[in-house]
Every structure is written in structure tokens, then in C-alpha cells.
Amino acid sequence: GAPDRLEMLLDKRVVAMADYDREHGTAYLQTAIMSVRFPGSPADAAAALNVHRNTYFYRMNKVRELFFIDLKDGDDRLALSFSASIMEGMEK
């Protein structure tokens, strides 16, 4: 069906991040999304997440380490943004 076709479009790293967050009570996906939403402004991204800047930087390092997503890379930013939007739509 349609959800199956949509799932094929998702970046596997983003799906893995969402699964990891669910299993471990972390917020890596939301942190990465805020990084894309507030490009070049870690302070604004941290404020949107209601966390200290150091917490934001720690999480972003974990995103790179655990999921091999570098949000300084345009393709990775696009993959995250696109996949997160589809996943959000599938939850509704």
C-alpha cells in the first residue's frame, strides 16, 4: 500500500535514529531536525529544544557517531529533512 511505498523513500539512517530514540528515550532526531531548521545557529536550535548549548552539541556529535549523518553535508540535510517530513506525515 501507500505507506509501504513511502517507507521505501525514507533514509535508513533517519529511521534508525527514530527507532533508537524510541528504544532509549533520547531525542537525537528532534535535535537533528532543529539543526536543519536553525542552520548556523546552535544557540537558536538549543533554545528551541529547551536544552543548554553543550547538550545540543553533545547530541549532534552522537548523531554523527551513531548514525553517520553529517548535517554540514547538504545531501545529509536534505535526507533528514525529507525523511522526517514523511515520517511525521505517516504518524498522522
Task: Pin down the residues of each PLM region.
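Cytosolic nucleotide-utilizing catalytic cores of signal-transduction proteins
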Residues: 1-92
